[in-house]
Regions:
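Elongated, amphipathic alpha-helical interaction scaffolds
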Residues: 1-274
Length: 274
């Protein structure tokens, strides 16, 4: 929704591809609006410089995105062949735009700045023979603080990440989601963050978030994320402690620490692991 004009979309394309296209008319938006894709509200596909780009937004991590990409690209290429009167049953090879699939992720679970998701990872047969079909989705984390170089070159995307972070912070402090949204939108408008967009589409943005927001699921996800981070941090501390004990040849302490939690805490404090 935020990238609802060619100028913003071209800026995003330039930021991702390190290009400097200036004419928005060079970009041909061809998002499918067929009934089959009505649920894919956050997708946009467009052609520029011989590349067929598919951009999709996801608020949860989904390893099945490459499979979605296959379905989507097959329809896009089918439309491209028809629109350009390409003869696929002749001996002459047809020329097609190169596909590029980008997934913008801003879920609450911690993910790296960039990750490649491959269709082949879904296949049951994992022998060394290369599959005849592959689709790669590049997932970019657009949560606030991630992909800072990308954000530096695309103000719209940076402001969107700030807005989402602002909404999340107010949800934690305000008594209702409605109050949180009102404050987040007012704050961003006052700080010139997506101000033009939020002024024009305030009601739509509010309604969209209220429609998709599940308070219980959101809080459960935050708790699960915190527990997972705690487990990872705890394992790192224990691994560090074990290394120190092994290096010092304190084998009896190592054995005792695996059975006695209080003694384990004492050793962690002794080695300054906190």
């Amino acid at each position: 929704m935020v990238f609802n004009n060619k100028e913003d979309l071209l800026q995003l394309y330039n930021a991702i591809n390190h290009t400097d296209y200036q004419n928005p008319d060079d970009l041909e938006v061809n998002t499918l609006e067929d009934v089959l894709y009505l649920s894919m509200k956050n997708d946009v596909s467009f052609l520029v410089s011989g590349t067929m780009n598919l951009y999709e937004h996801q608020s949860t991590f989904n390893p099945n995105m490459p499979l979605r990409g296959v379905f989507y690209f097959s329809r896009l290429y089918e439309g491209y062949v028809a629109d350009n009167n390409l003869m696929i049953y002749h001996e002459k090879r047809v020329r097609l735009p190169k596909p590029k699939y980008i997934v913008f992720y801003n879920g609450t679970k911690n993910q790296p700045d960039s990750m490649e998701l491959k269709l082949s990872d879904c296949f049951e047969n994992t022998d060394n023979e290369a599959p005849c079909l592959e689709c790669t989705a590049t997932m970019l984390n657009i949560n606030y603080g991630h992909n800072q170089e990308l954000m530096k070159h695309c103000r719209r995307l940076k402001e969107y990440s700030i807005f989402v972070q602002c909404v999340r912070e107010y949800i934690q402090s305000e008594p209702s989601v409605e109050d949180a949204l009102e404050k987040a939108i007012d704050t961003c408008i006052n700080q010139d963050v997506l101000a033009d967009f939020l002024k024009k589409h305030r009601a739509e943005v509010t309604n969209m978030i209220l429609t998709t927001y599940d308070k219980d699921l959101y809080e459960k996800t935050l708790k699960e994320d915190a527990r997972e981070e705690g487990r990872k941090e705890g394992m790192e501390y224990l691994n560090q402690l074990n290394k120190y004990l092994l290096k010092a040849k304190r084998y009896s302490d190592l054995e005792r620490a695996t059975e006695d939690i209080e003694y384990q805490k004492k050793l962690l404090k002794e080695f300054g692991i906190e």
